[in-house]
Amino acid sequence: MAPLQLAFVNFTKGSYIIVEGKRNADRFFIIRQGNVRLSKGVQIVAEEQGDTLGPGDFFGVVSTMSGHSHIETAQALSDVTLISVQKEQFSQLIQSNAPVAMKIILQFSKRVRYLDEALTRLTLKSNAVEDPSHIFNVAEYYAKQNQYNLAFFAYHNYIKYCPQGENAGLAKERMKKIAPFIKNLKLDHNPNEMLRTYAKNSMIFCEGEPGDELYIIQKGAVKIAKVVDNNEVLLAVLKSGDIFGEMALLESKPRAAGAIAYEDCQLMAVNRENFKQMIQSQPQLIARLTTLLAERIWLIYKQLANTQINDPLGRMYDALQIQLEKKKVDISNTVTFMFDFGPKELSNMVGLAESDGRMVVRKMMENRNFQVVNDKIFVKDVKEVGRQTAYFMKMQQLEKARKEKSSTVNYF
């Protein structure tokens, strides 16, 4: 393999290096000298690392690795010298400079967790709970849903991680009560066994429990969900080749969400020791993990901006557009599209109660371009999603401008 050759680029003070919304993200930058300021059109939450970057910091990685439009604008605060890294050079960068690659991955992981907590607060009006004691609440939820295998697994893990917990005795009683209904449940796997199989509706891990492994899906599908205020919130359905569980491994923090086999599946489990070895031996895997984290960050930023749309119908149209952009569907073309979720999940995405969501969906269905087919949302022309989203965004901007103007009127 040829040695890694990175280019140095210079920008004068005041220059715009990347611009939010532009779809030209084919490289990211590491600051060698000088300072750069990041800004966003819609600033929902303050970034943990701040908006001023210096030598050793990097920017543009999210959009470059995810293949989406830029989510921020970068402007030189002084004359700057930057190291330019093209997307296809990232695997080489991992092999030649593992510390830089790990810095990117660790920062991304922290960023995902931080932004996900902010999104939970804004959409679900609740704080995320990342503590083993929460496992009991998860177990109680699934028991009430008559999903006894999931409940038994969660009760078992609550006792495992909180043996002296205030609900330990109650958890044991619950386990005895539902034991007759348990079918083909496997509670533990050999930690030395990298390839593992899980039957449909089996719990792989529970939110709130410690985690020291990430998983790569070899076959099947996995549902990522969390229980908030006695409701299950679907976060994602992952397919073959996807990676999950990496944040707990990288940060040594409790699982932020639970993982359940959506279909019969086979997973490869990677522990910390194996992960360190893979950084050098399998740079493509680390590049894939970086891409995955970048896609999550991009998606959460879009979802955070969605929370600022006042009209619930506008939020729904925007949520559909986000999903189309996520799948890289060109909404400038007249094509049909079947979403892999229905009205209930769409209401959940925009933080509406099921009853409120049904009313808004009925209003959406008055537009003949939209239908519900086999409990999935179907659109006859994806351009209509873009048109409706643009309309509601324009109305939002006009309303904001009107309020700002009225607040600055001077009365004599």
Annotate each language-model stretch with its function.
Residues E48-I105, A236-T290, W298:
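Cyclic-nucleotide recognition modules
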Residues E117-H134, L187-D188:
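TPR-adjacent "capping" and linker segments in tetratricopeptide-repeat scaffold/adaptor proteins
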Residues M1-G41, I178-N231, S240:
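Regulatory nucleotide-sensing modules
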Residues R121-N127, I300-P312, D330-N333:
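Short, Lys/Arg-enriched, Trp-marked, Pro/Gly-tolerant hinge/linker segments that flank
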Residues E166-L214, K226-V227, E232, V237, ...:
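Charged, long alpha-helical assembly modules
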Residues V9-T12, V85, N127-N137, R196-A199, ...:
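Alpha-helix N-cap/N′ positions at the starts of helices
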Residues L93, A98-T120, G165-I182, I286-R296:
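Short, structured interface segments
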Residues D131-I178, P312, A319, E325-F412:
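Phosphate-/nucleic-acid-contacting segments
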